[in-house]
Amino acid sequence: MAASLRLRGAASGLRYWSRRQPPAVASLAAVCSRSMASKTPVGFIGVGNMGNPMAKNLMKHGYPLIIYDVFPDACKEFLDAGEQVVSSPADVAEKADRIITMLPTSINAIEAYSGANGILKKVKKGSLLIDSSTIDPMVSKELAKEVEKMGAVFMDAPVSGGVGAARSGNLTFMVGGVEEEFAAAQELLGCMGSNVVYCGAVGTGQAAKICNNLLLAISMIGTAEAMNLGIRLGLDPKLLAKILNMSSGRCWSSDTYNPVPGVMDGVPSANNYQGGFGTTLMAKDLGLAQDSATSTKSPILLGSQAHQIYRMMCAKGYSKKDFSSVFQFLREEETF
């Protein structure tokens, strides 16, 4: 699989691998000492909505897995498929020297790495630890320091694309860490994503993800507002979506993940906003953006408003629905 990926962007200084490019085996010559063809066990901690399909794609590429999740039921299908399931992150670290974590919050990540039964209790020297959670960049930096003390390598590699891209193996990974280890990380991440982008030092992957989700939240709210206004003005929602998507207002929220029920198939709005990326998680990510904006003295006027909207949604019963349910929220809120 790795041989089907090509290193791009050398002239611009941007390093990323894309499976969409033609194969170029020669591009693998500059890898580090880790074997790109290695099929030794890979640890995977956190097999929820995103982690589950990500882990399955590693299985499809022939990697044996060492699985842990705080909810044992989440591990059952992996156990039934013949993968090893263990009882703590420390047990994962004891059995695997390459580990991927996919967890909901900074607190969960800290516990998985530094807790009483965390990875760092039994991590091996030279291990590669990849965190695909979306967490505070400062937490990533602190975890990297702790991992380095143990003689291992930490990289942050949050994702974009949602559950659909996780299932199809088309996620985008934003990677921060030691550049010399990027190729080793890409070996695994390329099994789960179509784009693996090197962003810089530890924490820059998280920074890129926070910026992406800030824009995503704003564009989703904007799409929901525009669609709601058009419907109230008498436009057919499918027609309006078609017009937006051939005009300058087009965005991912309008053409790929439209928030209006009946406009698109295969998206949460077509399933009562079940599945997808939860409103609670979007509110969490916008909180991270708020914190980063405060620490860097960066004005995020629309981002702050988006944060308040998603927090309000969580308080009004939308916490378990997909974040595109902001359309439903706007329709039901007569105060707007």
From Swiss-Prot:
Endpoints of the signal sequence: none
SUPFAM superfamilies membership: 6-phosphogluconate dehydrogenase C-terminal domain-like, NAD(P)-binding Rossmann-fold domains
Iron among keywords: no
Location(s), subcellular: Mitochondrion
Keywords tagged on the record: Acetylation, Branched-chain amino acid catabolism, Mitochondrion, NAD, Oxidoreductase, Transit peptide
Active site: 209
Main location: mitochondrion
Record flagged with keyword NAD: yes
Assembly and oligomerization: Homodimer.
Protein name per UniProt: 3-hydroxyisobutyrate dehydrogenase, mitochondrial
Originating organism: Bos taurus (Bovine)
Phylogenetic placement of the source organism: Eukaryota, Metazoa, Chordata, Craniata, Vertebrata
